[in-house]
Amino acid sequence: MIGKIKKFNFKSLFILNTFALIVTSYLFNNFIFTGVYILFFFISIFITKNGLKIIKKFNFLQNIRDEGPTNHFKKSDTPTMGGIFMIIPFLILLLIITINLSSLKLILLLLTVFGFFITGFLDDYLSIKKRENTGLKTKEKFILQSVISIIFILLAYEKNLISPLITISDSWAINMNIFILPVAFLVLVGISNSVNLTDGLDGLAAGCSGIVFYGLGTEILLKGQQELFVFSILCFSMSGICLGFLKYNSYPAKIFMGDTGSLSIGAILGSIALLTNSIFTLSIFSGIFIIESLSVIIQVGFFKITKKLFHRGKRIFLMAPLHHHFELKGVKEEKIVENFWKINILLVILGIVLKINL
């Protein structure tokens, strides 16, 4: 069905995601899930539309890296830091819920997301100030991410908020014991940077994130644990926020989320997956993010190895991340994004089917 749609755009994705959420709400006999999704979808549209004026007023404009595809130079001076309008509504919702429930899990989630939000904000702000594509140095950004992640992981592990088990199904789990700590670090820092790398084409990261948040929210519901339902509400809210932002971020983008958005989105996904023991399923849902990240690792690794062996570096892809490879192959930007969305939808369906049947 998905493959037969001639043009799968923002509206198509919203309609499909909304339909899926209505079905999910019906099956779980609770339409609050659809309600928060719709509410935050329109909040996101309203805030982004009006926030664009503020971004333009302060000249928070994107700088394009010289090493990227040449057709991206026309995107220079597109308003950026749109992640502010995505993450602040989420943080306000999370703060309200945290105050009402006084949950240590929610407190840790709030502080972790806020930490990644500030990291992304600093990176974007310095990039704009320096009129360069990079704000914080790679090492500086990694150190900040690492410190925030380690604090979150150690506190959560000490309070037994992170399970040492990686649950594959109700009857099958892998006991990682103390090794869950490096796994948790890899999940949190890895998914954050993977979303960041995916945010290279108009609407790619925002669309995929909206799809993944729906999948993660549904997977948590399938656990049947009442105390975890609040995390489903948070996921569905973020799904609505991402798709609301997508209205202005889809091709041709009027605004970019920047690291303020992408790093925070990854932190939300990783933190919630760790706190709800959903690592395995998230790894399936996030297939696009993971592939994008792996393409960079493979490209850099292969180049360094061949340079050492043959004194001349060789590349597997025309350019990494993977979406740039397809761009240089001549595939239109919107077509690449459309196909990546479709693949992500199939990955979410696969993850949910496995969750139900394993």
Swiss-Prot record:
Pathway: Cell wall biogenesis; peptidoglycan biosynthesis
GO cellular component terms, A-Z: plasma membrane
GO MF annotation, one: UDP-N-acetylmuramoyl-L-alanyl-D-glutamyl-meso-2,6-diaminopimelyl-D-alanyl-D-alanine:undecaprenyl-phosphate transferase activity
Pfam families for the chain: Glycos_transf_4 (PF00953), MraY_sig1 (PF10555)
GO biological process: cell division; cell wall organization; peptidoglycan biosynthetic process; regulation of cell shape
Cofactor(s) named in the record: Mg(2+)
Subcellular location: Cell inner membrane
Catalysed reactions, semicolon-separated: UDP-N-acetyl-alpha-D-muramoyl-L-alanyl-gamma-D-glutamyl-meso-2,6-diaminopimeloyl-D-alanyl-D-alanine + di-trans,octa-cis-undecaprenyl phosphate = di-trans,octa-cis-undecaprenyl diphospho-N-acetyl-alpha-D-muramoyl-L-alanyl-D-glutamyl-meso-2,6-diaminopimeloyl-D-alanyl-D-alanine + UMP
The EC number(s) this enzyme carries: 2.7.8.13
InterPro entries: Glycosyl_transferase_4 (IPR000715), PNAcMuramoyl-5peptid_Trfase (IPR003524), PNAcMuramoyl-5peptid_Trfase_CS (IPR018480)
Residues that span the membrane, as ranges: 13-47, 81-101, 106-126, 148-168, 171-191, 201-221, 228-248, 255-275, 278-298, 336-356
Mode of membrane association: Multi-pass membrane protein
Keywords, alphabetical: Cell cycle, Cell division, Cell inner membrane, Cell membrane, Cell shape, Cell wall biogenesis/degradation, Magnesium, Membrane, Metal-binding, Peptidoglycan synthesis, Transferase, Transmembrane, Transmembrane helix
PROSITE patterns: MRAY_1, MRAY_2
Functional summary from the UniProt entry: Catalyzes the initial step of the lipid cycle reactions in the biosynthesis of the cell wall peptidoglycan: transfers peptidoglycan precursor phospho-MurNAc-pentapeptide from UDP-MurNAc-pentapeptide onto the lipid carrier undecaprenyl phosphate, yielding undecaprenyl-pyrophosphoryl-MurNAc-pentapeptide, known as lipid I.
Similarity field: Belongs to the glycosyltransferase 4 family. MraY subfamily.
Protein's name according to its UniProt entry: Phospho-N-acetylmuramoyl-pentapeptide-transferase
Naturally occurring in which organism (per UniProt): Prochlorococcus marinus (strain MIT 9301)
UniProt lineage: Bacteria, Bacillati, Cyanobacteriota, Cyanophyceae, Synechococcales
Record gene name: mraY
